[in-house]
């Protein structure tokens, strides 16, 4: 019985994933407050990476790369909007903290994806990864500016 239920629910979940992604994107796009936008990026980023992973599994590297670039654009725009508020991220971490969580998770998931690609396929993904890593480092530095820096 449980197996039959699982089989009947699986198509619904597969169908609802694009709907969920569209709903999350719509809520993200409508949000005007940078802190709330950063908070909305967390579930949106997870849903986008679910889609990216599926595209990689289906052999659609171009679609996956476009999705990854879209995530990068969203993360960059949230950072710019947060910075435009001219508030100290160390004292007012709202938004920065959520953005850093999302970017860190994106980097982790991207690292897991890249190993499944050929070296030729990896390069454009690694280019985006480098930009996301730079964003992550900036966010950490803004959130924790008084921490000693590693002089490597």
Regions found by a protein language model. Name each.
Residues 14-152:
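Long, charged/polar, soluble alpha-helical segments
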Residues 1-10:
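Bacterial N-terminal signal peptides
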């Amino acid at each position: 019985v449980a197996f039959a239920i699982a089989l009947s629910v699986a198509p619904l979940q597969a169908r609802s994933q694009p709907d969920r992604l569209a709903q999350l994107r719509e809520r993200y796009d409508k949000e005007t407050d940078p802190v709330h936008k950063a908070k909305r990026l967390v579930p949106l980023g997870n849903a986008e990476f679910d889609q990216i992973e599926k595209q990689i599994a289906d052999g659609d590297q171009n679609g996956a790369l476009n999705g990854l670039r879209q995530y990068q654009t969203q993360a960059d725009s949230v950072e710019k909007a947060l910075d435009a508020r001219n508030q100290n991220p160390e004292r007012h971490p709202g938004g920065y903290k959520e953005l850093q969580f999302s970017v860190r998770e994106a980097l982790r998931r991207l690292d897991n994806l890249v190993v499944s690609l050929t070296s030729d396929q990896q390069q454009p993904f690694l280019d985006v990864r480098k930009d996301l890593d730079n964003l992550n480092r900036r966010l950490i530095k803004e959130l924790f500016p008084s921490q000693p820096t590693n002089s490597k």
